[in-house]
């Protein structure tokens, strides 16, 4: 009991009548442009290494009690 082909076709025709072909074309173009911009932003983000990433610290671990004795 899902949506069949005829129901989808009827829904498309109703949307076409309500909005018109020109408006649907504009909406489709805007949606495509938004998706393209989103993909470009995601690929740019993957190319850049993060500056706030993890750093390796080197040194000697000293117990606080031993430090006070010296």
From Swiss-Prot:
<keyword id="KW-0812">Transmembrane</keyword>
<dbReference type="GO" id="GO:0008320">
    <property type="term" value="F:protein transmembrane transporter activity"/>
</dbReference>
<keyword id="KW-1133">Transmembrane helix</keyword>
<keyword id="KW-0653">Protein transport</keyword>
<keyword id="KW-1003">Cell membrane</keyword>
<dbReference type="InterPro" id="IPR003369">
    <property type="entry name" value="TatA/B/E"/>
</dbReference>
<comment type="similarity">
    <text>Belongs to the TatA/E family.</text>
</comment>
<dbReference type="Pfam" id="PF02416">
    <property type="entry name" value="TatA_B_E"/>
</dbReference>
<keyword id="KW-0472">Membrane</keyword>
<dbReference type="GO" id="GO:0043953">
    <property type="term" value="P:protein transport by the Tat complex"/>
</dbReference>
<protein>
    <recommendedName>
        <fullName>Sec-independent protein translocase protein TatA</fullName>
    </recommendedName>
</protein>
<keyword id="KW-0997">Cell inner membrane</keyword>
<feature type="compositionally biased region" description="Basic and acidic residues">
    <location>
        <begin position="57"/>
        <end position="70"/>
    </location>
</feature>
<keyword id="KW-0811">Translocation</keyword>
<comment type="function">
    <text>Part of the twin-arginine translocation (Tat) system that transports large folded proteins containing a characteristic twin-arginine motif in their signal peptide across membranes. TatA could form the protein-conducting channel of the Tat system.</text>
</comment>
<comment type="subunit">
    <text>The Tat system comprises two distinct complexes: a TatABC complex, containing multiple copies of TatA, TatB and TatC subunits, and a separate TatA complex, containing only TatA subunits. Substrates initially bind to the TatABC complex, which probably triggers association of the separate TatA complex to form the active translocon.</text>
</comment>
<feature type="region of interest" description="Disordered">
    <location>
        <begin position="42"/>
        <end position="70"/>
    </location>
</feature>
<feature type="transmembrane region" description="Helical">
    <location>
        <begin position="1"/>
        <end position="21"/>
    </location>
</feature>
<keyword id="KW-0813">Transport</keyword>
<dbReference type="GO" id="GO:0033281">
    <property type="term" value="C:TAT protein transport complex"/>
</dbReference>
<dbReference type="InterPro" id="IPR006312">
    <property type="entry name" value="TatA/E"/>
</dbReference>
């Amino acid at each position: 009991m899902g949506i069949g082909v005829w129901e989808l076709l009827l829904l498309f025709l109703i949307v076409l009548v309500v909005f018109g072909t020109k408006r649907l074309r504009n909406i489709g173009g805007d949606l495509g442009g938004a998706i393209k911009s989103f993909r470009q932003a995601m690929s740019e983000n993957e190319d850049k290494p993060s500056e706030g990433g993890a750093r390796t610290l080197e040194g000697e671990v000293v117990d606080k009690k031993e430090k006070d004795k010296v």
